[in-house]
């Protein structure tokens, strides 16, 4: 099975792909962005993709939400897993921290290490990279000039032959990233255990005071627990939003189905993004 992920080799996404059971038949396909990973499923270039959707420190991964919202309706969320994230400060060679001129990484990783960067590397310029592994690759290939460092995994440091200057630099320690599986087909409904349903909805142009409360009350009134809610701009101007919600249960469970049906009476649009087994 071809499995897309945010590349290059050495990213946390690649680590997450192989974190669960049954991975022996996976053919990993590194892709340049989260958007590309999702769209590779849409276009049939891979059967599945694993992409980050939220981090315990930095919150939602907007690229994932926006791609699902604006770019495709042909894929769905088919599973999830949670990966502990332990960032390292990495350089091509051992170097004193006060000599580092710049630190490069994915913006999510830089945000997760903001306190460390502010207190230990206050003079370093922060440079965005496409992924944590790409940041380590940049540092590994950089020759001459002032020393640069990257934020990434110990595995990436080993892969690119770099030195780990400090480990556990995320603030606070214990960061976790939730990843979701993207597929064209729904997971086997016969799987037992706890399930979740992800959906998105957006407000009508004539929304009135209390609109969002009424939407969410449809779940509370049926004792359906919401496990996540996020808002994103609809790109129609200031003050227009779409909302992403996860709830316990499957979309065809009676209480969940009734809540979604009632939600449609309030919202301009509702899309079920998928029902899937919850991570342990």
For the regions a language model picked out, list residue spans one by one.
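Domain-level signature for soluble enzymes in the chorismate/prephenate branch of the shikimate pathway
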Residues: 1-280
């Amino acid at each position: 099975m071809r499995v897309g992920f945010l590349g290059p080799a050495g990213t946390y996404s690649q680590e997450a792909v192989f974190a669960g059971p049954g991975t022996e038949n996976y053919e990993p396909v590194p892709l340049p962005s989260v958007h590309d990973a999702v769209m590779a499923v849409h276009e049939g270039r891979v059967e599945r993709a694993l992409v980050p959707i939220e981090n315990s420190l930095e919150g939602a991964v907007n690229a994932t939400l926006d791609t699902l919202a604006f770019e495709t309706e042909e894929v769905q969320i088919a599973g999830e897993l949670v990966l502990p994230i332990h960032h390292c400060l990495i350089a091509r060679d051992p170097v004193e921290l006060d000599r580092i001129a710049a630190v490069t990484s994915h913006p999510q990783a830089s945000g997760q290490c903001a306190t460390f960067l502010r207190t230990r590397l206050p003079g370093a310029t922060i440079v965005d990279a496409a992924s944590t592994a790409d940041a380590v690759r940049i540092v590994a290939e950089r020759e001459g000039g002032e020393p640069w460092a990257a934020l990434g995994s110990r595995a990436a440091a080993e892969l690119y032959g770099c030195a780990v200057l400090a480990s556990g630099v995320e603030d606070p320690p214990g960061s976790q990233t939730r990843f979701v599986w993207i597929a064209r087909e729904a997971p086997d409904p016969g799987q037992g255990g706890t399930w979740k349903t992800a959906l998105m909805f957006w407000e009508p142009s004539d929304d009135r005071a209390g609109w969002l409360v009424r939407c969410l009350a449809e779940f509370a009134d049926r004792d359906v627990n919401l496990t996540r809610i996020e808002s994103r701009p609809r790109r129609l101007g200031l003050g227009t939003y779409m909302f992403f919600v996860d709830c316990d249960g499957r979309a065809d469970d009676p209480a969940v189905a009734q809540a979604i049906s009632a939600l449609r009476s309030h919202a301009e649009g509702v899309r079920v993004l998928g029902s899937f087994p919850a991570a342990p």
